[in-house]
Amino acid sequence: MHNFDFAKPSTIADAAKALAADGAQALSGGQTLIPTMKQRLAAPGVLVSLTGIAEMQGVCTGDGGLHIGAATPHAVVAKEARAHYPALADLAGGIGDPAVRSRGTIGGSIANNDPAACYPSAVLASGATVVTNKRKIA
């Protein structure tokens, strides 16, 4: 693995600023990124941790929908989404093993189009809107 700098912002604005740096890569669960780095297939100059950003964590309801932060682990999605979206909870509960479910995140799976997680298909099938710091993708 190559050397890298590490940033741990506490707000979305600070994360966006850190991610604007050349060679920066977002990190939350790291279930895809870290193995890729170990194989020397990726060499980001800066890892920007999203785990300390409260707005990117958890599952809540509001505005007629279910809101899931990108840094929310699969295990939390499996538990917290059950009452409102059982199919999504089942999907999240079937990803990997308990260790992967406790670290891997919904945002990482969607961003990497991870075929083992099936979240990209769930996003399309449910008509979900993905909200970033710059735009809404529906």
Question: For the regions a protein language model found, what residue spans apply to each?
Answer:
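C-terminal structural segment of proteins
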Residues: 1-138
